[in-house]
Amino acid sequence: MKPSSARPSPLSRRSLLAASAATALLMLPGCGGGGDGGSAGVGTGGTGSFTSGPIRGFGSIVVNGVRYDDAAAQVVGDGGAALARSDLRLGMVVDVSGSDVSTATDGRRSATATSIGVRSEIEGPVSAVNAAAGTLTVLGQQVQITPTTVFDDDLRGGLAAVAVGMVVEVYGFLQPSGQYLATRIDDEDDPVTHYKLRGVVSGLDTAARTFRIGTALVSYADIAASVSGLANGQYARVELQLTPDASGAWRARSIRLATTAIGMPAGDGVKAEIEGYITAFTSDARFSVAGIVVDASAVGQLPPGLAVGRRVEVEGVLSGGVLVARSVEFEDDDDDDDDEFEIEGVITSVSASAR
């Protein structure tokens, strides 16, 4: 993640609303500690709230329609490093733990954040850009750009400003198809010490000590002595050496495993709201989002067409590791809500000529 001193950065989405003042992680021994972003701060006694999704507003931070006061929150990156609140940016995907959500008379929801975990999907060199298709390729993974993808200050031209060889950090969602949908892309203009890839393990070869994430071949031979529990179908966060081995495989320097893509809090009774893709589907009443089992049997009106590959927002309560839903909505990039930012703060000056 690129450090920064102020927020928000110049915006690259289609509109801005300005308002006036008003774990599921399984650790590999010897491969580091902590969760991917983490969910500390929600008690195991069944109190508090948890939400996971892109930052869509400031004035504190707005995630999934909830305004979280982040003044006292602990902010960490998915590698466990402490971050400043000023490092948070629009489009970054975060896991937020905090107090119970309250709803004002005008319908606005708010809570106090205790921890904010930031997680990106890919960090590495761009090997291809397809402007016509709206995609780029990073570490062998195809990344889809949408009209709502946010680009950082160094990429104000959007996808047209991205060049082959540039090292970028991609925030967003892994789709069941293996393609990544980008909610934000940062240009890593400072030298990096490693690359990073998050995805689902496949093609595990324990003899060769390799596996794949998408099309990328990863070798864990250098850290094999500390690796245990690796299996196909697991979610993995892999830090990679900057150069591949002689066979072309990317060399892992650390691996972190999880059963889900989102580091959900432990305990029952926590109110949770998550955004992601349906990764498994049994029926309208039972499916998984980012590996998290959802029980939607009590939802009065479900959107038609629920299926693997649909992006949804689910709100409910955690019980026995299952998210018992009380609402399920599609979350598509052509929704009007996704075309807007929300900024709240004190107006310090007004330019009549600029309007």
Describe the function of each predicted region.
Residues 2-70, 78-355:
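Short, flexible, surface-exposed loop segments at domain boundaries
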